[in-house]
């Protein structure tokens, strides 16, 4: 069984032939060349991720702020616990995805991980915005 290897920051001896590119344990240069991708699904994933992008300031929460105090205690408790769990998940994902990327040797796939990391940070921000409902 092969051992997982972290990719180098730059490898001048890495493979430039896209046919030799591997998702894990490849001989990557670690240079981005998104015109030559081994994994073409990345383009569709990238477009979808960018189309789904939003920021918390775009969401009007004024009715949520009014509705929260009117929820029954059990629903407020459920809401608070779910929100805290989602903040936890976003935090773990934001911290963990770069560590996974250290082992991905197909740069186009690392693009996906970078975008997901960024969007998890935004999710964390939006979750924190929702904690103001409880104030």
Where are these regions (language model features)?
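Conserved small/polar residues in nucleotide/adenosyl-binding loops
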Residues: 131-135
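Alpha-helical bundle segments that constitute or directly flank the non-heme di-iron/ferroxidase center
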Residues: 72-103, 122
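Active-site-adjacent bridging/hinge elements
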Residues: 57-70, 94-95
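Generic serine detector
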Residues: 43, 62-63, 84, 91, ...
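Extreme N-terminal leader/anchor segments
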Residues: 1-61, 75, 109
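Amphipathic alpha-helical hairpins
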Residues: 96, 108-130
